[in-house]
């Protein structure tokens, strides 16, 4: 029986939602992830230190007492965020980053930033205190094709930010294009990126060919196969600039299977198992541990986890759905087989 033991991984980008959904989302993310960067796009969003810390308390309350999972909190940036709020958040030791959502770019992003120039005093403060900037890298101009919005964002917004703030650590989250891979590779060492399991395993054909599959619909949207191959090459390259971030984003079943369905794919039920499948297919299982367990912690300036988990190559069938609050969430690979499972 083939097995793989790796240092306990972390998830550097996950959505847990709020309220009674936390009982289910925290259960899934805390099964074997040591830490996770928690997205702040709630309703209303966690725009200040106090709301982020209150959200952290609700997450901690939802996990079992013996579970050592640690939520790492994030501020939601708006046009009204102040440099003083950044300093206050950093001083807590519990808020590790601030998130740039271009207004309207994704779920619950209507309060996001309308112009990057509005943020420059805040970005200066972040660079001073050592707080990371997390970026949803898409423009929201409706005249820009949805498949081009990441590329245009890199060219028109992020390139200038990287130039203007050489001491600011920036994570370009859930990258989806060869353009983003090239951008990060050419950028200085203060720029890195997360890559999701579903963008490694799937491309837009999986979502659109032979019928629309709404559970593959996420933002940034799945791209063509050539971009998928660039992501696989980046993730398995051994470059410290790329690390695990699931962007697992739960939506109730009827909100996905709808005439105007929500964007987001749920992968927290089997995150490391999905990554293992992608890395094995690329002949790079030996690169999984660093991608999942080392590079993210190193970039954030946090210690690596010291304990381990073990995966075994034993196929199992993913349930058709999982409980979410008083409803159900349909995960990636629902009703299908997965090759790997965590056994300890």
UniProtKB/Swiss-Prot annotation:
Keyword Hydrolase set for record = yes
Instruction: List the catalysed reactions.
Output: (S)-dihydroorotate + H2O = N-carbamoyl-L-aspartate + H(+)
- Stored CDD domains: DHOase
Identify the keywords attached in UniProt to this record, alphabetized.
Hydrolase, Metal-binding, Pyrimidine biosynthesis, Zinc
What highest taxon heads this organism's lineage?
Bacteria
Which positions bind Zn(2+) 1? 13, 15, 99, 247
BP GO terms, sorted: 'de novo' pyrimidine nucleobase biosynthetic process; 'de novo' UMP biosynthetic process
Which GO-annotated molecular functions does the record name? dihydroorotase activity; zinc ion binding
The main enzyme category here is hydrolase
Active site positions: 247
Q: Which residues bind substrate?
A: 15-17, 41, 136, 219, 251, 263
Enzyme Commission number(s) from the entry = 3.5.2.3
**Residue numbers carrying N6-carboxylysine:** 99
The record's remark on the cofactor is: Binds 2 Zn(2+) ions per subunit.
What's the stated role of this polypeptide?
Catalyzes the reversible cyclization of carbamoyl aspartate to dihydroorotate.
What protein family does this chain belong to?
Belongs to the metallo-dependent hydrolases superfamily. DHOase family. Class II DHOase subfamily.
Subunit and interaction comment: Homodimer.
Know the name of this protein?
Dihydroorotase
Source organism: Shewanella denitrificans (strain OS217 / ATCC BAA-1090 / DSM 15013)
């Amino acid at each position: 029986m083939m097995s793989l033991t790796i240092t306990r991984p972390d998830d550097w980008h996950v959505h847990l939602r709020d309220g009674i959904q936390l009982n289910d989302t925290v259960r899934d993310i805390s099964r074997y992830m040591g830490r996770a960067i928690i997205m702040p796009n709630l309703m209303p969003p966690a725009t200040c230190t106090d709301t982020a810390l209150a959200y952290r308390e609700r997450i901690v309350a939802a996990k079992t007492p013996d579970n050592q999972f640690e939520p790492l909190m994030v501020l939601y940036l708006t046009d009204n965020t102040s440099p003083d709020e950044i300093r206050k958040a950093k001083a807590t030791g519990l808020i590790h980053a601030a998130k740039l959502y271009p207004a309207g770019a994704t779920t619950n992003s209507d309060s996001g930033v309308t112009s990057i120039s509005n943020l420059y005093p805040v970005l200066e403060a972040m660079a001073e205190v050592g707080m990371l900037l997390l970026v949803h890298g898409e423009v929201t101009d409706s005249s820009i094709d949805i498949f081009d919005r990441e590329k245009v964002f890199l060219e028109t917004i992020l390139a200038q930010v990287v130039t203007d703030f050489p001491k600011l650590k920036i994570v370009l989250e859930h990258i989806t294009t060869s353009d983003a891979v090239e951008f990060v590779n050419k950028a200085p060492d203060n720029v890195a990126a997360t890559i999701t399991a579903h963008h490694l395993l799937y491309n837009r054909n999986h979502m659109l060919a032979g019928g629309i599959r709404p559970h593959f619909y996420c933002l940034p949207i799945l791209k063509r196969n050539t971009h998928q191959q660039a992501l696989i090459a980046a993730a398995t390259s051994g470059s410290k600039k790329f690390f695990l971030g699931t962007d697992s984003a739960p939506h109730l079943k009827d909100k996905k299977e709808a005439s105007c369905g929500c964007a987001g794919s749920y992968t927290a039920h089997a995150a490391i198992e999905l990554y293992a499948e992608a890395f094995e297919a690329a002949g790079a299982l030996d690169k999984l541990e660093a991608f999942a367990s080392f590079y993210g912690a190193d970039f954030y300036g946090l210690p690596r986890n010291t304990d381990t988990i073990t995966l075994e190559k034993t196929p199992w069938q993913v349930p058709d759905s999982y409980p979410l609050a008083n409803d159900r969430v349909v995960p990636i690979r629902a009703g299908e087989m997965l090759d790997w499972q965590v056994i300890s």
